[in-house]
């Protein structure tokens, strides 16, 4: 995953499509899910003919399977990294969270796999999964109707006085400072 800043500009054509080691195209938007278009890499598949059109890529069943397989493999690898070394995964989260968040909101199957390793970060720099965070704030951040109240800041520096006021009431404050 390349490092992405909050004001990122999408750079496409970083993934090249090959068929039996023969270059086909670097326009792979119909093969690779949108949320993974910023990745760099090579796809080589014997199932894609050498002479391929955009309409073929859009309608071919094997191309759809490749797209689903890519999504599954990325989610499985991220899940493996999370389970294997959570601290290291947390260090990488700032670089990969935009991919994961975009994937979660744009691809239901990716969401099903990613919901267990997607992280939330609070203003103290601590990371939680959504389930962990719900448990953490359940006792102190529930309204009169027993709904959880999520307090967040988009800029810790500019909103410090609000953050301190929330912390004085024993609220935990999430830091949601990304574009998603």
Functional labels for PLM-detected ranges:
Residues 1-180:
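Conserved GHKL (Bergerat-fold) ATPase module
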């Amino acid at each position: 995953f390349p490092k992405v800043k909050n004001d990122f500009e999408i750079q496409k054509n970083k993934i090249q499509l090959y068929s039996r080691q023969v270059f086909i195209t670097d326009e792979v938007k119909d093969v690779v899910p949108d949320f993974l278009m910023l990745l760099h890499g090579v796809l080589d598949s014997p199932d894609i003919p050498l002479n391929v059109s955009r309409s073929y890529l859009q309608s071919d069943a094997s191309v759809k399977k490749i797209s689903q397989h890519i999504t599954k493999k990325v989610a499985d690898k991220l899940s493996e990294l999370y389970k294997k070394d959570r601290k290291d995964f947390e260090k990488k989260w700032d670089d990969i969270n935009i991919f994961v968040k975009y994937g979660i909101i744009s691809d239901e199957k990716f969401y099903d796999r990613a919901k267990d390793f997607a992280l939330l970060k609070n203003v103290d720099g601590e990371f939680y999964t959504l389930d962990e965070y719900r448990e953490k704030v359940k006792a102190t951040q529930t309204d009169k109707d027993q709904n959880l109240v999520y307090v967040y800041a988009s800029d810790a520096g500019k909103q410090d006085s609000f953050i301190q006021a929330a912390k004085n009431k024993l609220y935990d404050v999430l830091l949601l400072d990304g574009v998603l």
